[in-house]
Amino acid sequence: MKPFCFSLSGIYESEGYAWEQAGKIWDLRELRGTDGYLDPETEQFLEAELGRKKETKELPRIRLLDSGNYHYMSKLLLGLEKEDLFLAVFDHHTDMQPPALLPVLSCGSWIRDAAGAYQNIKGICVIGPPEASVRETEAMEHVWFVTQEELDDGSGAAKIKEVFASLSLIHI
């Protein structure tokens, strides 16, 4: 299956991404209000278009979301899911920061926003942020962290196994 690519910044072109490897490309580079923070009007447009693409089966399950400035697209895509789910996120950031100014969706807040918005998300495990970032993050029910330090010292693997086992996703 070939990936569906969201082209928002031009990163694929600058990195020499082979477009022939992509299944479909949605060129959104001209869309305003998307760099790091998502304008509410643009968010409504994207939600409607993503819903349409899902209904018409134009949205395969493998998706490339551009650079880290557009991680908030994950929150919009999670909004399309109706079944219960558990999300594993590999990132060096918690992506659970409250917005600095206005209550807008951002690349740094999308996990926090998704955890609070969708009842079908039964758990989120964020794997990779530094311990200092996790300490600064407001705790939320059903959100777990495996820090970079835990990965480095080897204790992270056991913690990941515990998290998955507590959700009955694997049997120990």
Segments and roles (model prediction):
Residues M1-S7, S14-A18, K57-S74:
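…; additionally, a secondary subgroup of soluble metalloenzymes is captured
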Residues M1-T42:
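N-terminal glycine-rich anion-binding loop in soluble enzyme alpha/beta folds
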Residues Y12-G16, A132-T137:
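Short, charged/polar "capping" segments at the starts of alpha-helices
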Residues L28-P60, D66-S67:
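Active-site-flanking structural segment that lines cofactor/substrate pockets
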Residues R63-E131:
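Active-site histidine-anchored catalytic micro-motif
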Residues V143-S155:
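Short acidic-hydrophobic, aromatic-tinged amphipathic segments that line or gate anion-handling sites
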Residues G154-S166:
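Short amphipathic alpha-helix with an adjacent loop that forms part of the alpha/beta core around
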